[in-house]
Amino acid sequence: MFLSMNWIQDFVDLSGLDKIELIRKFSLSTAEVENDILRKGSEISGIVVGEIKSVENHPDSKKLHLLKIDAGEDELIDVVCGAPNVKVGLKTAFAKVGAKIGEITITPRALAGFTSNGMCCSEAEIGISDDNSGIMEITDDVKNGTDLKDIYEIDDIVFEVDNKSLTNRPDLWGHYGIAREFAALAGRELKPFDLDDLKAYDGLKKIDMKIEDTLCQRYSCLQIENINRNVSPVNMRIRLFYCGMRAVSYT
């Protein structure tokens, strides 16, 4: 089971403490931490919000586009991009010259006869999801030139716990239970877990059900209503991806 320190810190304030040391203490006192502790986001820098101001088709390529990007600087930046979802007004993750993605440092690069002074990135390229279908799409309310790490929880510390060591601890099968352990280790207060007033659901219509086989001692049903198909918030998608899961539609 992968665990996110950002998620844990929703429930306990660990500011000012050495998170790596806390994870090591957790491994010794509660459950074995497997493999390496991952510092997510440490491999990228210089990724900012860039707005596409113009789009032209490449004269010699059906796949490439010539873009002008507003990255919050005095002048627009010329970029060559082959993503299928480019359009004027789209804000995206833009790696400026000098930005780093893993072991790659972005430099001016000649592509099909034009110089690209940066790179428009997909979520997969910056390591926050496996979506490489096109460049990342960012909401219009974010200022051009804003560092992506200032608006999204890209920096995180993720560690993996051996499931076998938690078999007899169902209270640790989620981030809140793990946060309780960290609160004890750090001497910090555990924040209450807010729940809806369950009495508000007492009057719900019961599900009609008939058990025909007397050998069936119990059968449970759950009805879920008012589900929407909205895209999950970016930070939630990042957390799920870091923990080895994907945000998928119920359909």
Predicted regions and their residues:
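Phosphate-backbone binding interfaces of nucleic-acid-interacting proteins
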Residues: M1-G203
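Residues forming anionic-ligand binding surfaces in small-molecule and nucleic-acid pockets
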Residues: L148-K164, K205-C243
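Extended, well-folded interaction surfaces typified by the phenylalanyl-tRNA synthetase beta subunit core
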Residues: G177, M236, R246-V248
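Conserved small/polar residues in nucleotide/adenosyl-binding loops
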Residues: T251
